A protein has these predicted regions:
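Short helix-loop hinge/linker segments at domain boundaries
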Residues: 1-9, 18, 29-30, 65-73, ...
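N-terminal winged-helix
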Residues: 3-32, 36-49, 213-216
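Short, well-ordered beta-strand segments
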Residues: 7-11, 59, 128, 174, ...
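A late-sequence structural motif
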Residues: 20, 162, 178-180, 190-233
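Short beta-strand-centered segments that line the small-molecule binding cleft or hinge
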Residues: 23-27, 45-100, 191-193
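Hydrophobic hinge/microswitch elements
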Residues: 43-47, 52, 62, 132-190
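Short secondary-structure boundary segments
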Residues: 63-64, 86-87, 177-180, 204
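Secondary-structure junction motif
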Residues: 90-92, 97-147, 214-218, 222
Length: 234
């Protein structure tokens, strides 16, 4: 009854929003049809600025460090996996580590039944990376270095979906979110591998400006996400 004529602005970094926020919006609108909800995507610098100038209520993100200006609530985790061109010779000796498309897409590999691939097997292969400012780029490089080699990066790209399609063309190995596979069709052109490095597991946060008044709409949206508004991460 308190949420009949209010507005709520929820935004996210690109791709995370298209995959996650759409479903949440449907649930929220069904429960609170009177709330006007704006959902946008953008780059992390613009979105952080919007959060701090109060034009954005809640931000779904993976890369803003905790600090004096924001409060973060853990929403979920995502897994980074390898997408390797099927034509690469290295795949022949790694058959026991390969995942089926559905297995990779649905996260069924998270248990112990699927073994992580030995990353050092790819030391001589070309890689497709996201650009340096992207958190996945930093994680990708760290995963390779932790395996004892410096990756041979052929190309730096802006979007993770583009890196998927470039890998599909055979140009190099891409680090992708496993949830991306829910947005594409199965293909024989790629083979998927689990990564054992802790850097491959990434937190997704719902973030708000610290000290800002928590509206009933914001509180309701957080609770819909199974988040306790009074319990931000310290």
């Amino acid at each position: 009854s308190d949420l009949k004529t209010v507005n709520l602005s929820v935004v996210s970094v690109a791709f995370v929003g298209s995959f996650v926020l759409g479903g949440l919006l449907i649930l929220f609108k069904n429960k609170y049809p009177g709330v006007s909800v704006e959902i946008h995507e953008g780059n992390i610098r613009e979105l952080r600025a919007g959060l701090l100038d109060d034009s954005i209520d809640l931000l779904l993100e993976t890369a803003i460090p905790a600090g004096d200006e924001v409060e973060r609530y853990l929403y979920d985790y995502e897994q980074i996996i390898l997408a390797v061109p099927a034509e690469f010779e290295v795949n022949k000796k790694l058959r026991s580590f390969q995942m089926a498309f559905a297995q990779a897409r649905d996260g069924a590999f998270r248990g112990k039944d699927v073994q992580p691939v030995p990353m050092q097997a790819f030391r001589d292969c070309p890689f497709i990376f996201l650009k340096e400012e992207n958190d996945i780029c930093m994680r990708s490089r760290g995963i390779c270095r932790n395996a004892g080699f410096e990756p041979k990066v052929e190309l730096f790209l802006d979007q993770i979906m583009t890196s998927f399609y470039v890998a599909k063309s055979g140009s190099g190995i891409a680090f992708i979110r496993n949830s991306l596979l829910s947005l594409v069709s199965d293909t024989d052109a790629l083979i998927y591998y689990k990564i054992g490095d802790p850097l491959a597991r990434r937190e997704i946060f719902m973030t708000r400006k610290k000290g800002r008044y928590m509206t009933k709409a914001m509180e309701a949206f957080l609770r819909l996400c199974h988040i306790r508004p009074e319990k931000p991460i310290e």
